[in-house]
Amino acid sequence: MEDIFNFFDKPKDPLHFSSIKISISSPDKIRERSFGEVKKPETINYRTFKPERDGLFCAKIFGPTKDYECNCGKYKRMKHRGIVCEKCGVEVIPSKVRRERLGHIDLATPVAHIWFLKSLPSRIGNLMDITLKDLEKVLYFEAYVVTDPKDTGLAFGTVFSEDQYQKALEEYSYGFEAGMGAAAIRTCLTSMDLDQLSEQLRIEMQEATSEAKRKKTAKRLKVIEAFKNSGNKPEWMILECIPVLPPELRPLVPLDGGRFATSDLNDLYRRVINRNNRLKRLMELQAPEVIIRNEKRMLQEAVDALFDNGRRGRAIAGPNKRPLKSLSDMLKGKSGRFRQNLLGKRVDYSGRSVIVVGPELRLHQCGLPKKMALELFKPFIYNKLEERGFVTTIKSAKKMVEKEKPEVWDVLEEVIKEHPVLLNRAPTLHRLGIQAFEPVLIEGKAIQLHPLVCTAFNADFDGDQMAVHLPLSVESQVEARVLMMSTNNILSPAHGKPIIVPSQDMVLGIYYMTRDKHFALGEGKIFASPDEVNIAWDAGEIHLQARIKVRMKNLVSDEKPTLIETTTGRVLLRDILPDAVPYATINKVMTKKELSNLVDVCYRLAGNKETVILADKLKAIGFRYAAKAGISISINDMVIPEGKPAIINRATEEVQEIQNQYTEGLITDGERYNKVIDIWAKSTEDIAKEMLDNLSRDTILDPEGKEVKVPSFNAIHMMADSGARGSAQQIRQLAGMRGLMAKPSGEIIETPITANFREGLTVLQYFISTHGARKGLADTALKTANSGYLTRRLVDVAQDAIITEADCGTIDGLTVSSLTEGGEVIEHIGDRILGRVALDDILDPVTGDVLVPANEEIDETLVAKIEAAGLEKVKIRSVLTCESRRGICAKCYGRDLARGHLVNRGEAVGVIAAQSIGEPGTQLTMRTFHIGGTASRRAEQTALEARNEGFAKFININYVTNSEGHHIVMNRNGELAIVDETGREREKYGVVYGAKIKVSPQEKVAQGQSVAEWDPYTMPILTEVAGRVKFGDVIEGVTMEEQVDEVTGLSRKVIIETRDTDKRPRITIKDESGKTAKIGENLLARYYLPVGSNINVLEEIEVNAGDVIAKIPRETTKTKDITGGLPRVAELFEARKPKDFAVITEIDGVVAFGKDAKGKRKVLVTPELGEPKEYLIPKGKHISVHEGDHVRAGEALMDGSSNPHDILRVLGQKELAKYLVDEVQEVYRLQGVKINDKHIETIVRQMLRRVRVKDVGDTNLLIDDQIERWVFEEENEKAMDKGGRPATAESLLLGITKASLSTESFISAASFQETTKVLTQASIEGKVDSLRGLKENVIMGRLIPAGTGLALYRNLRMVAEEPVIIPEPAEPEDEEIYEEEA
């Protein structure tokens, strides 16, 4: 019916536009767009409820309130279309124009637009070169500004206070013009000549001497250039008339009881109109200046409040003391227009309900309650009912559905077939939070979810709810089925390993059936084929876990079957394996890890379809055997180790011993604390180890009656061992000891909880543990928010990283090697290069054969080849070095992790990267409290043991031999390697300064032999020569104080900070003749002492080479938890400078110390050729290099964390990327979370995409401009084509927030943060948004230029309107595992 009214309207096509521009509106523009002036503050008549004429809701200006009906009722209905009623002046048209017609208010005096005034930096202030403070004084009528100096010699734009103005008047009489308020500012802005000003400023900039002046001029120049280029006029920043929003967008809604609910805007407009009308009247009456001035100020304030309430002064509040919501507030923040309505909308055809488990569903199905389906599929049902001839009209179909007649259910079944629905669980942290399923109708009101997809949704069935959405168009159904179906999302986009893996009870069931039991029924029997095993099992002749031998093929490639040792359960499990998967994959105890591997292997060898079938069968068999096993736990399963009292007593004695050392003054309090913590941490680990050994071994009698140790079937152990539930840490607390706890401040309490939960805690122990438990819960709440915010920033910065071309043809890449930490490999090279593309041919180091040709994807088989060849380094293509101008090319990205093949064009890899990094953030934050707040802290490493036997090799180690014959390391970057006979390095360790090496070069080392040791809690200062100790500048009370320990009564000398910059506390070593001893040729044995170091020697005593003369204590350690982790990740991605960052050297060279300057130490680095570079290091910071050390560029000269900006400047992009990737990965690795490197690289690429112009050459760029790298390259190409000089620039590292805000698209930036600031800047520049990214297009309501929305795929249209039938996965032949056993 409603269509009939719009019958005469021309059909409105959606507007086709390719870009959108924002600029400042001129007063003429505002009036031109307006449909009339609003003159009165009235809204509607209180009796008739009709809009008042000329008021805020006036029908004459904004259109009729009812369709095709004028206000007075003279003209009604369609036949009078377009007539203007002569009585009330209302046009007879549809009422929806009230949503689009603007009005305006003519102001009696000009008013400044608050955005251009107060949004920092103030644009009006910048243009006129007046400070914001002065500008406000002028605008709010507290000061005068000179608008025309004429010939008085006053400067244009000088600001006078009232007194100064009177004086100036006396001095110059009326030889100049000055004014106050926005009118005066407008006069100034109008009279500005931008071209002349711009030239003058450019000259000033070249002549400027100080950096500050240059920067200030550059800022002004930027604003002026923006105005010049955009065609905006400066005076438009001052308003003469104000547009009035269409009334439907600021509605007045009658509530019951005769009251009205209104939008705050109406109040704000009313204020403006009232003050404006009063001002007009006062001006007509020629009121005194003071009164008019006050009224003008009030008008300015009213307009300010309308545009941005609370930006200046106190926010205007409504009757309920709540600040009124202004136009800016409508756009800003989470509930503003951008984020609430444009980026995410609520949709129809959706519902939500509680979820329950659906173990009998297939992987691609979900159970949908009939009630829900009936509501969701209504239009489809009506259509089918009509088609079937059950009804003739929609109305009767409606009735039929309401009555729920039997035919309706039949039709519903038919409609649902082949029509996927989307299920979504909030929070949707990654793309697997929305997946498509085929609905199966079920009774009841809860949605049934397949148990295997719970991991992806992070769902459990303790009351979680999920939403259902229905894709309507054929295109969307195809996309849902092909791209979003749960069966097509087996691999996780974050790390490329399967995410559809059995968990919890399924794991337990499969683990139980693949375990082997000693001396079970049928042990040692030999079977000719797996079928025989099945027969024997059905007959009850063999036990499920009996160890038997079967003739069969172990690998698919085997020539003929062989006898294989296995168990009954594993042979039964073999029945569900696809043929392509070798038996060896499951001929072991299947833990969760092994199951994950099985799904992975199946996906690679047998393909997607087989994997889906296998996953479903694993689910069924897992549930079945978990039920059959009937595993339960009792308190007796928590076996407390017998050795526990002994270990605790030993630890208590050690602690007492350390306490005694402390009372004797041998160690400091900090050392004592650290050692005590270490003893307890180690004891806890010992008890845990003994307990786990006990749990995992049972002693039973064999048939001969001898005792044998066999793997145990203890239920708790099985659950943890299989990976079904629980961890060693939790079992440790149940049956070992709870261990150390953390204080609220994060420090560790040095008395641990020696009891466990089985023994029960004492009151004190319980009290200590409450804190940790609560902290866990509080952390969770806080960090979920932080993690969500991190994800939001990441998505925003990476949203335009899309695969746009197949190959960019770059010749650059990254070199990747295995990651080692403390000598052990934590990530193999194979894992790091899998799915990447080789940059050059990868050659076998021995034979020289090509293992992988250049530009080829490195898949599983090639990785095996590379690892077999023993390659240490491989060059691969990387997102960081990709040369695509917009987006990224497929070759540089490599494999699409979720699909297992090279990435497709149009894939939004940036968003996937952001989700992959952000999602575990939330997971991790939610994982703190499960351990119950027990302090997890590794015992510090204090010694190195050789893992392999071989010969010791010193690499770059300077050492002296001390009196005991040990080698003491005297430099920082030395390494100790163990090499075999052929000279190949088997392992390599960095050794710290001051470490004791217990072997000599080339000495034979046995496996497990201790080769080096050091004190992890202090940094020693050692002497390199023997001699007598002499102190310099060690003056008590000035540079040193004796700290007396309250407990021990002993004193120690500690260096303190001093005001006196000339005093440099040091220890000198004198030789026999009393001169300062020399180290080598020309270095003096003089050791400077940093603040906080403890002096270990007395003056005048004799020392030997390698003796410790002073110690610098390290900070006491805090617990490592992702709490430190999440802020750490944010800090890395925000590219913040660390608090005490280390100064690094920019060149290779030799270190020397210069004279101190201004309380800072001067370090000189002298290269072989060229000038030495000097670095100033704050006093009291420990300098980690020694005189005469050789340093490489990028090495730190002092203790502290690295500053990423320095790394970029000194070592370049690749090193920076490597640093960021490694640091971020370390945080996640500590939590056991896997993320592929390429995701972090993608984000880093987005952080590095801008450059800062250093020298403009012959281009149109401005100095210090920050621009996108490809814009810079294009400008240079243009200049060089004309034979000009190219510009130079330096790489910039922007934090993710900065990078998001500096994107090309103003719509995207405005919807992210600081909306008003972004829009202000964009409108001054007259910015054009060419809608290239994802966000801008979502906001404009277009298809996004990624995935199927890419122009490449856009012209593919669905031709067939018939139902698209995609064949079902074939029913598996062997269905017996679904049937219940008789």
From Swiss-Prot:
The UniProt record gives the binding positions of Zn(2+) 1 as C70, C72, C85, C88
- Reactions catalysed: RNA(n) + a ribonucleoside 5'-triphosphate = RNA(n+1) + diphosphate
The residues that hold Mg(2+) are D460, D462, D464
One GO MF term, please? zinc ion binding
List its EC numbers: 2.7.7.6
Q: Which free-text remark accompanies the cofactor?
A: Binds 1 Mg(2+) ion per subunit. Binds 2 Zn(2+) ions per subunit.
- Keywords, alphabetical: DNA-directed RNA polymerase, Magnesium, Metal-binding, Nucleotidyltransferase, Transcription, Transferase, Zinc
- The signal peptide stretch is none
- Enumerate the InterPro entries for this protein: DNA-dir_RpoC_beta_prime, DNA-dir_RpoC_beta_prime_bact, RNA_pol_asu, RNA_pol_N, RNA_pol_Rpb1_1, RNA_pol_Rpb1_3, RNA_pol_Rpb1_3_sf, RNA_pol_Rpb1_4
Q: Identify the cofactor(s).
A: Mg(2+); Zn(2+)
User: Can you quote a single GO CC term?
Assistant: DNA-directed RNA polymerase complex
Top EC class for this record: transferase
- HAMAP family in the cross-refs: RNApol_bact_RpoC (MF_01322)
Which family is it part of? Belongs to the RNA polymerase beta' chain family.
The record, for PANTHER family, names:
DNA-DIRECTED RNA POLYMERASE (PTHR19376), DNA-DIRECTED RNA POLYMERASE SUBUNIT BETA (PTHR19376:SF54)
Q: How does it assemble?
A: The RNAP catalytic core consists of 2 alpha, 1 beta, 1 beta' and 1 omega subunit. When a sigma factor is associated with the core the holoenzyme is formed, which can initiate transcription.
Q: Which NCBIfam families match?
A: rpoC_TIGR
Its annotated function is as follows: DNA-dependent RNA polymerase catalyzes the transcription of DNA into RNA using the four ribonucleoside triphosphates as substrates.
Name of the protein this chain belongs to: DNA-directed RNA polymerase subunit beta'
Q: What is the lineage of its organism?
A: Bacteria, Pseudomonadati, Thermodesulfobacteriota, Desulfuromonadia, Geobacterales
